[in-house]
Design a protein with these regions (language model features):
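Helical element adjacent to the flavin cofactor pocket in flavoenzyme catalytic cores
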Residues: 148-205
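Central helical "cap/lid" subdomain
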Residues: 199-246, 377
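C-terminal catalytic lobe of FAD-dependent flavoproteins
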Residues: 157, 293-411
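Glycine-rich FAD pyrophosphate-binding loop
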Residues: 30-51
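Dinucleotide-binding Rossmann-like beta1-alpha1 core, especially the glycine-rich loop
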Residues: 55-134, 254-259, 263-265, 290
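Short beta-strand to alpha-helix junction loop
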Residues: 69, 99-107, 147-166, 176, ...
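Beta1/beta-strand and adjacent pyrophosphate-binding region of the FAD-binding site
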Residues: 7-21, 38
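Active-site lid/adjacent beta-loop-alpha segment flanking the redox-cofactor pocket in flavoenzymes
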Residues: 223-224, 239-344
């Protein structure tokens, strides 16, 4: 193969993966002053899971100080990126409401709200009547309360990624699309380069942001990464007559659903309690923008339950019932940091469907870690050093993934 003129022979850092995490890491490395950064993307930016993300930008919900800070930073970053880069992010601070539909959820959400307030998130507990005033289409006669964050909302995931990519390019990052990483070179337990079909790039640091493909890329270098793809669903309705403008995002874990406006109708997103792992034996690398055949029989009861919270969704036509692969980990925490098996090999993957709402902050954390040798926040709970080799075996991934997606909406 002829080496493209644009393929450098050396880079200070090579990032593999052009989704929101990869572009954010590139952006923050450049923002902190590092030059000679290269990002490799096998297909096109966003072609893995970022393109089909729902785009929720929510700071409420975590009881981790680190995770809450990362979410808050991400929301603030998305709010200012357009002014910096000229590329829209689609950020709309329309608000977010978490619905407590029983006493147990009420107790849990009050505890979460108190912790989030401590972390600087303005969370208000509101009555069922106030929930309906903000989201008139919701059925509220069986709920206890709502928890409202006015500054939260939604973004366009593709636009966010393009804005981060543009911001990175403006600071000198070289983004190469259509260039896969086929291996990582090493010597004496340390990264020395990245192999591509067009030649090798010498480097001291590799960042695996390959999303769905992170496990396979890690395995090439003996790095254990225990993420696994699973089916993930949302429905988009036909246009709804007299749909109130700028309703907040609504979420009801007891109904397995979240709801936001989409193209004149509503999106109904799902986190079912028992999910379906996808491609246990390996994720296909030759197909970008994966759009899977929905399992109507399995998902029908969950969809029915979710639609009951917003009854109009079952009274209008259905534009699309989308199923796409999303990456989950056994403990529902991201896998980030320097791999214990190989010095200079960093990982940021396994985002468990929160890649958009943590992407900005996680890219910052990775940049600090690479540049300074330490992250700028406590990442103990998500550090890759907790991953054991057996957790990457197929049966373990299958059995744990069946449960892990359902943990998102489980009452804790």
């Amino acid at each position: 193969m002829t080496t493209p003129p644009s393929l450098p022979r050396h880079a200070r850092v090579v990032i593999v993966g052009g989704g929101v995490i990869g572009t954010s890491t590139a952006y923050h490395l450049a923002l902190m002053g590092w030059q000679d950064i290269v990002l490799l993307e096998r297909h096109q930016l966003t072609a893995g899971t970022t393109w089909h993300a729902a785009g929720l930008m929510v700071t409420y919900g975590s009881t981790s100080e680190t995770s809450t800070e990362i979410r808050k930073y991400t929301r603030d970053l998305y709010g200012r990126l357009e002014a910096e880069t000229g590329q829209a992010t689609g950020f709309m601070p329309i608000g977010f409401i978490e619905v407590a539909s029983d006493k147990d959820r009420l107790e849990e959400f009050r505890r979460v709200a108190a912790f989030n307030r401590y972390c600087g998130i303005d969370v208000q507990e509101i009555s069922p009547r106030q929930v309906q005033e903000l989201f008139p289409l919701a059925k509220v006669d069986d709920i206890e309360a709502g928890f409202y964050v006015k500054e939260d909302g939604r973004v366009n995931p593709v636009d966010v990624t393009m804005a981060l990519g543009k911001g990175a390019r403006m600071r000198g990052v070289k983004i190469l699309e259509g260039v896969p990483a086929t291996g990582v070179l090493q010597k004496s337990g340390r990264v020395t380069g990245v192999r591509t079909p067009y030649g090798d790039i010498q480097t001291d640091f590799v960042v695996n942001c390959a999303g769905l493909w992170a496990r396979e890329l890690g395995a090439m270098s003996g790095v254990a990464i225990s993420n696994q793809a699973a089916e993930h669903y949302y429905l988009i309705t036909e246009a709804i007559k007299d749909l109130p403008p700028n309703m907040p995002v609504l979420e009801d874990p007891s109904a397995y659903g979240y709801y936001r406006q989409e193209g004149g109708g509503l999106m109904v997103g799902l986190f079912e309690p028992v999910c379906a792992p996808w491609k246990i034996d390996g994720t296909p690398t030759d197909t970008p923008y994966l759009d899977l055949e929905p399992d109507w029989e399995r998902m029908g009861p969950y969809l029915e339950t979710a639609m009951s919270r917003v009854p109009v969704t079952s009274q209008v036509g259905m534009k699309k019932f989308f199923c796409g692969p999303e990456s989950f980990t056994p403990d529902l925490k991201p896998i980030v940091g320097e791999a214990p098996e190989l010095r200079g090999y960093f990982v940021a993957a396994g985002l468990n469907s929160i890649g958009i709402l943590t992407g900005g902050g996680l890219g910052r954390v990775m940049a600090h870690w690479i540049i300074n040798g330490l992250p700028d926040v406590d990442v103990t709970g998500m550090n890759i050093d907790r991953v054991l080799p057996f957790q990457a075996n197929p049966e373990y991934r299958r059995s744990r993934t069946v449960e892990s997606l359902g943990m998102v909406y489980k009452c804790h």
